Swiss-Prot record:
<feature type="transmembrane region" description="Helical">
    <location>
        <begin position="116"/>
        <end position="136"/>
    </location>
</feature>
<feature type="topological domain" description="Extracellular">
    <location>
        <begin position="65"/>
        <end position="78"/>
    </location>
</feature>
<keyword id="KW-0633">Potassium transport</keyword>
<feature type="transmembrane region" description="Helical">
    <location>
        <begin position="79"/>
        <end position="99"/>
    </location>
</feature>
<feature type="topological domain" description="Cytoplasmic">
    <location>
        <begin position="179"/>
        <end position="311"/>
    </location>
</feature>
<dbReference type="InterPro" id="IPR002524">
    <property type="entry name" value="Cation_efflux"/>
</dbReference>
<dbReference type="InterPro" id="IPR036837">
    <property type="entry name" value="Cation_efflux_CTD_sf"/>
</dbReference>
<feature type="topological domain" description="Extracellular">
    <location>
        <begin position="137"/>
        <end position="157"/>
    </location>
</feature>
<keyword id="KW-0406">Ion transport</keyword>
<keyword id="KW-0864">Zinc transport</keyword>
<keyword id="KW-0171">Cobalt transport</keyword>
<comment type="function">
    <text>Involved in divalent cation and potassium homeostasis in the cell. Catalyzes the active efflux of zinc, cadmium and cobalt, in exchange for potassium and H(+) ions.</text>
</comment>
<feature type="transmembrane region" description="Helical">
    <location>
        <begin position="158"/>
        <end position="178"/>
    </location>
</feature>
<dbReference type="InterPro" id="IPR050681">
    <property type="entry name" value="CDF/SLC30A"/>
</dbReference>
<keyword id="KW-0812">Transmembrane</keyword>
<keyword id="KW-0104">Cadmium</keyword>
<keyword id="KW-1003">Cell membrane</keyword>
């Protein structure tokens, strides 16, 4: 049940953050145009990607709650990961555009209405601080990729607002017009970094990669070290979505075991694996007589057929 309460809290946090950020983003975009500040516009661009990522995260949560059906036996849990990829890609594109725009401006800094820029960026900082605080106190910023993504966005947004504030102050006091494009580039690099990381982690999950926090050798030792298991092969460990890890393998046991004895062994293994963060476990029990390649990790069928022709 803990899981459900958590999802509800996460959803509420996302909804409140979405409303606050979208509202402020509109103000900041208009402000950026009126004051002619690229730092504000780049921060608004970042806010836009935030607001999209929050919206997608909300849709992902809603979809992930839909039950699995005959057509999608895992349910819609992966949507969250697809959403994270799209979001990451959007961040990368936005940041590259801002860098391009800023380089243009260095050679020819336009006139910026600094007071407006300063006011808007200070409001932005306050909004970001509020949203970050709501996320920290109410959401699961550690384990849930979607909330983590949204939280990282907000944190780098905050840096964006700080950048715009500093740029406005530099222009007001020293007349340094280049401070505006410089602040934009710094924000853009931060955006690029978080976009790259979110995309990389999501693609790893889509490629059925081994979850980050799982040590395969340790898992093999754990299963093979369980009394009654002789060895395992055809092992797969993957993430269905962030925080939901699955494992399947074939385990060789003594052919004299009764079904209830093998159930006991399974229960032990499931218990051990749950402590290591794997909750969805499928183990096929076999005896020595069941002929298989003994590779711990599975080979594709094509290779197996080739091997059989040689025998």
């Amino acid at each position: 049940m803990g899981h459900n309460h958590n999802e509800g809290a996460n959803k509420k946090v996302l909804l409140i953050s979405f409303i606050m950020i979208t509202g402020y983003m509109i103000i900041e975009a208009i402000g950026g145009f009126l004051t002619n500040s690229l730092a504000l516009l780049s921060d608004a661009g970042h806010m836009l990607s935030d607001s999209i990522s929050l919206m997608v995260a909300l849709i992902a949560f809603t979809l992930a709650e839909k039950k699995a059906n005959h057509n999608k036996t895992f349910g819609y849990k992966r949507f969250e990961i697809l959403a994270a990829v799209i979001n990451g890609a959007a961040l990368i594109l936005i940041s590259l555009y801002i860098i391009y725009e800023a380089i243009e401006r260095f050679s020819n800094p336009p006139k910026v209405a600094t007071t407006g820029m300063l006011t808007i960026s200070i409001i932005g900082l306050v909004v970001n601080l509020l949203v970050a605080w709501i996320m920290m106190s109410g959401g699961d910023t550690k384990n849930n990729l979607n909330i983590r993504g949204a939280y990282l966005h907000v944190i780098s947004d905050m840096l964006g607002s700080v950048g715009a504030i500093l740029a406005a102050i530099l222009i007001i006091f020293f007349g340094w017009g280049w401070a505006d494009p410089l602040a934009s580039i710094i924000v853009a690099i931060l955006v690029l970094r978080s976009g790259y990381n979110v995309t990389k982690d999501s693609i790893h999950i889509l490629m059925e990669g081994t979850p980050e926090n799982i040590d395969v050798s340790d898992i093999i030792r754990t299963i093979e070290g369980t009394e009654g298991i002789q060895n395992i092969h055809d092992l797969h460990i993957w993430s269905i979505t962030s925080g939901l890890n699955a494992l399947s393998c074939h385990a060789v046991v003594d052919d004299q075991l009764t079904i209830s004895e093998s159930e006991n062994i399974l229960r032990k293994i499931e218990h051990e694996l749950e402590h290591k963060g794997i909750t969805h476990v499928t183990i096929q029990m076999e005896t020595e007589a069941h002929n298989h390649d003994n590779a711990i990790l599975c080979q594709p069928k094509m290779e197996k057929q080739r091997d059989h022709h040689h025998h």
